[in-house]
Amino acid sequence: MSAQIAPAEQVCYVHCNFCNTILAVSVPGNSMLNIVTVRCGHCTNLLSVNLRGLMHSAPALQDHHHHHLQESGLSGCFRDQSGYPEFGFSAASSSSKLRLPPAAAAMVSYSQQNQQLEQALHARPPEKRQRVPSAYNRFIKEEIRRIKANNPDISHREAFSTAAKNWAHYPNIHFGLSPGHEGGKKLVDVDPIPTAPSSKKIQGFYS
């Protein structure tokens, strides 16, 4: 905390029995004999605290809480938009109520369990992103399936070779056109097998 506590103020430590949080607050000297209501900024639980009883607590316990807040590194003054401390004080006597000025700082130390939970959340490894199949991979997969449906006896290697040739010979497929036709041409299901030219029968001339 950057601002130093005025000598007329006294630091008191209040334990929230609802969320197990230690609240460190500074109270002006003229309010030390009052019964105040402390609002926990962690769980918003209201606590009625007798400051006179806190002043008679053991000094060693106060020093322990102060040392714990310094080591945790989470101590700080939390203020709302109006400038008042987040843990508002009000003197709750039978006849009057008193709200402390903004100079009365309020600090909070989260429990060790909450610290471990936050560290575990930040230490999670980044999830691996699944790569989206490219247009080529999607086309080859669908083309092999189509070729095998039309020709069940074809091998996977031949179907893959034919699908790759269809991708190379029909570039408009790259732009999302129908895989069945491209420019009036039909996709090849299998590679054509060259055949020997057939002999033609020569008819003779009759005289």
Swiss-Prot record:
Disulfide bonds: none annotated. One of its GO terms (biological process) is cell fate commitment. CDD domains: HMG-box_SF (cd00084). InterPro entries: HMG_box_dom_sf, YABBY, YABBY_C, YABBY_N. Pfam families: YABBY (PF04690), YABBY_N (PF24868). One of its GO terms (molecular function) is zinc ion binding. Keywords: Metal-binding, Nucleus, Zinc, Zinc-finger. It comes from the Eukaryota. Expressed in leaf blades, leaf sheaths and flowers. The keyword Zinc-finger applies. It is found in: Nucleus. A zinc finger (C4-type) spans 16-43. One of its GO terms (cellular component) is nucleus. The keyword Zinc-finger applies. Belongs to the YABBY family. This is Protein YABBY 6. The gene is YAB6.
